[in-house]
Each structure stands twice: as C-alpha cells, then as structure tokens.
C-alpha cells in the first residue's frame, strides 16, 4: 500500500517518499510532509543550483547552502535562490 502525505509544496494529498531523504530533523520533516512529486521538483532545482553556480559538493559551505535552500524550498514559501542568468529551455 502506498503511503500518502499532505504535501506542503503541492498543497494536496499525494504519494509520500519511501524513505527519509536526508538525515536529521529536516529529513524527518520532509519525509512526513513532502510528496515524491515535490521531491522530484526539488532535485531538478538542486541540480540547476549546483550546475549554474558551479557548486563543489565536497565543500561544506556548498552543502550547507543546499540544505538551507532545501528547507526554504519546502517550508519557506518557495523563497529560494534562482541561478543568475538561468534561462529555462524552450520547447
């Protein structure tokens, strides 16, 4: 049976994550309140931030920045950084 959550990002009930995606209290909060669909959206945004800002994930400051952005993406009203000069692909 699929685990359902009231997703804070989508504002509706949706399929929940299968496991806690990050350790700690933030990971628990995400597991309990974020859907698979919203998590996939974060992964796309995170990839854009890493690539456009040329973040080195071996750098503790870069990892801390991404954790802060993740919390803001889900629980900060969507108030997250956008990569400077990023232009979404045209279809």
From Swiss-Prot:
Q: In its UniProt record, which GO terms are filed under biological process?
A: cellular response to oxidative stress
UniProt-listed InterPro entries: Fe_traffick_prot_YggX (IPR007457), Fe_traffick_prot_YggX_sf (IPR036766)
Which residues are listed as membrane-spanning? none
Which GO cellular component terms are attached? cytosol
Give the highest taxon in the source lineage.
Bacteria
Alphabetical list of SUPFAM superfamilies matching this protein = YggX-like
Q: Does the keyword Iron apply?
A: yes
The keyword Iron is annotated on this UniProt entry? yes
Q: What does this protein do?
A: Could be a mediator in iron transactions between iron acquisition and iron-requiring processes, such as synthesis and/or repair of Fe-S clusters in biosynthetic enzymes.
* NCBIfam families cross-referenced by the UniProt entry: PRK05408.1
Q: Which family does it belong to?
A: Belongs to the Fe(2+)-trafficking protein family.
Protein name, UniProt field: Probable Fe(2+)-trafficking protein
Q: What is the lineage of its organism?
A: Bacteria, Pseudomonadati, Pseudomonadota, Betaproteobacteria, Nitrosomonadales
